[in-house]
Amino acid sequence: VGAGWTHDPFRADIVDGKIYGRGTCDMKGGLAASIIAAEAFVETHPDFAGAIEISGTADEESGGYGGVAYLAEQGYFNPDHVQHVIIPEPLHKDRICLGHRGGWWAQIETKGEIAHGSMPFLGDCAVRHMGAVLAEFETKLFPAMAARRTDMPVVPEGARSSTMNINSIHGGQKENDDDFDGLPAHCVPDSCRITIDRRFLLEEPLDQVRDEVRGLLEGLRETRIDFDYELTEINSVLPSMTDQTAPIVQTVSQAIRDIMGKQPEYVASPGSYDQKHIDRIGKLKNCIAYGPGLLELAHKPDEYIEVDDMVDSACVMGATLETLLLPRK
């Protein structure tokens, strides 16, 4: 759960109208709101003959391929089976999320030659080669990405540009266990690996994203002595956007106006979520993310969800169900 918590991350303390705990915001608060909305609808309209389905899949953070992607492949999001989808991600109770940026994940390995650490000139340090890669990123790739801007309404503001995170770096020998009290081996590392997390814009083709990184690596191969690398793609997700005129967008918009007395804000998410599978595998375009919570709190110490926000979102979801599913008077 990370360091810095002042509340037990697994106890769901309620303090000043906020429920604290790991996952309360992202996205158990939204899931709870959707369950309350569905239960209230069924209780209020016991003769309703249609179907309301809540899918509580568990692997969205690791790609969603065993959850929503599997359901989509089995036809559960076929427009003949399901007509409207709300994913209760924490984009805030007065926002409607139309889609998300794209993502490209890859591993880069720089290669060297092992040798005794007292004679590094007899080997070739893969970590130093990786340092050259990182320097290219700092001087060329990061400034280029920061200069790009999208017309997608991505929040927060910093995500309106392309971004890349270096998720991990590993080089040389395996780290020793905490209880190891010896000295590290004296070896020149012959391998160094980083995992990159590149988030790209609707205006950027995926091939351009790949080629930009590979081009920097090829440039180093040409200019740096003995530089060698291997680039392995881990996963890719294309950007997704639902049209603002879609029925689910218009219906939730009106519910926000009616329940909260304010105009909704239309946004896009900096990271991908299960809409990518519903859109491209399920072929259902009538899908949004809507739910309580502040996206900036996701995965943070003292993550919380406000009870009042959950109630308001449940009311919006309930009103949406009535509009979409009941006969018009």
Question: Where do the PLM segments sit?
Answer:
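Acidic/His- and Gly-rich active-site-bordering loop/insert found
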Residues: 1-22, 43-48, 294
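Short glycine/proline-enriched loop/turn "hinge" motifs that connect secondary-structure elements
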Residues: 2-4, 46, 97-103, 185-189, ...
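Acidic-glycine-rich active-site phosphate/pyrophosphate-binding loop
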Residues: 2-15, 99-109, 288
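Acidic/histidine-rich catalytic neighborhood of metal-dependent amide-processing enzymes
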Residues: 27-101, 329
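Short glycine/serine- and small hydrophobic-enriched flexible loop segments
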Residues: 36-43, 132-138, 319-322
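Acidic-enriched catalytic cores of C-N bond-cleaving enzymes acting on peptides and small amides
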Residues: 98, 117-180, 185-188, 202-228
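Hydrophobic beta-strand positions in extracellular immunoglobulin-like domains
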Residues: 110, 198-200
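An extended, acidic, His-containing surface patch that forms the Zn2+-binding/catalytic region
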Residues: 142-176, 228-329
